[in-house]
Structure formats: structure tokens, C-alpha cells
């Protein structure tokens, strides 16, 4: 099977959480270093963003807005003020999507957006397999002053069938 074809398969959150875990920790630590106390942060429902939560817990007076079902519980456990987007739940990735999620995001202006994807092509296209999750990510990027892609090495050079944005549309890409 083609390596790019494998990236088109929806892998459940609980399995993805274990993949590239050391690399995700390095990326999460770097990403959290951008966030000063008192920031408002969008986190998507990716496992890479989820790994940031313990590092964000070291900050004071944050507000984190997320469409991640599992992220909400972790944020609460870490005593971080959190807002869930609500919406329809995609069970495989534990993400809220849909019009309710988009409306909630549009009500806020965040300082930062941290998100992940399934593919970052050599020409800078950021892609994923989930159109509904991409819509949520796009709305987060639109309503954040700065947006960063959290990118593990397995995503580089891959292209999935739904375009999210390009590297030129965001502030930066954080890698291990």
C-alpha cells in the first residue's frame, strides 16, 4: 500500500496518542514556550495539541478554547480555565465539529492557535483527511493573532485530500 494512502485512514485518537510520543513532547514544550501568562489559546482536537496541556499548566491565567473532547478533561484536571466549543462529536478523533463549534470559535479572539494536520507537502500545503475538522481549524486560525502548526516528522512530504491552508497562511511550523 502507498505510504500516502495510509495517511488517508482515520486512526482513532487513543492510538494516535501513542505515535511519535517523544517527538510530540518536544514539539509541545517548544510551542508552550511561545505562550505568556494571561493568553487566550485555541487548541484543536489533535493529539499534538493535547500533549501541550501539561506545559500550559505551568502558565498563569490562561483561557484555552478547544474542540477536543479529551482535551477538556485534561485542561480541567490541570486547573486551566477552559471553554469547549460544543458541536457534533466525531467519535474516532474525540472532536467537536459542525456549526455549533464554528459559532463558538467565532465569538472569541485568541492570542494563539495551535493545531496539527495529517500532511505538510513539500510546497507548503497543509492538509488533512477530515473536512469537518479542517473547518474548525480554519475558524481558529482566522480568529487568532498567531497560529502554529505542530508537525511531527511523519507528516512532512505528505498530502491528504482536504486542503486546510498553506504555510504562508500561518505564523509558523513547530517541529522537534
Q: What role is predicted for each listed range?
A:
Residues 43-44, 66, 175:
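Short beta-strand scaffold positions
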Residues 18-22, 26, 47, 59, ...:
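Residues at secondary-structure transition points
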Residues 1-42, 53-58, 73-80:
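HTH-adjacent hinge/linker in prokaryotic transcriptional regulators
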Residues 62-65, 82:
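Short beta-strand element of Class I
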Residues 38, 59-61, 144, 170:
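A general structural motif
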Residues 70-176:
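Conserved phosphate- and dinucleotide-binding cores of soluble alpha/beta proteins
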Amino acid at each position: 500500500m502507498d505510504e500516502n494512502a495510509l495517511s488517508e485512514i482515520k486512526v482513532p485518537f487513543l492510538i494516535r496518542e501513542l505515535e511519535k510520543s517523544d517527538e510530540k513532547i518536544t514539539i509541545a514544550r517548544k510551542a508552550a514556550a511561545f505562550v505568556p501568562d494571561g493568553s487566550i489559546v485555541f487548541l484543536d482536537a489533535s493529539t499534538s495539541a493535547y500533549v501541550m496541556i501539561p506545559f500550559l499548566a505551568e502558565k498563569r491565567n490562561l483561557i484555552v478554547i478547544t474542540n477536543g473532547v479529551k482535551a477538556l478533561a485534561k485542561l480541567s484536571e490541570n486547573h486551566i480555565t477552559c471553554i469547549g466549543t460544543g458541536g457534533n462529536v466525531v467519535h474516532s478523533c474525540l472532536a467537536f465539529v459542525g456549526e455549533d463549534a464554528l459559532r463558538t470559535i467565532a465569538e472569541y479572539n485568541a492570542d494563539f492557535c495551535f493545531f496539527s494536520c495529517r500532511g505538510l507537502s513539500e510546497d507548503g500545503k497543509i492538509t488533512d483527511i477530515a473536512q469537518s475538522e479542517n473547518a474548525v481549524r480554519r475558524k481558529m486560525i482566522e480568529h487568532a493573532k498567531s497560529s502554529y502548526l505542530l508537525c511531527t516528522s511523519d507528516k512532512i512530504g505528505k498530502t491528504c485530500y482536504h486542503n486546510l491552508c498553506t504555510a504562508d497562511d500561518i505564523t509558523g511550523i513547530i517541529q522537534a
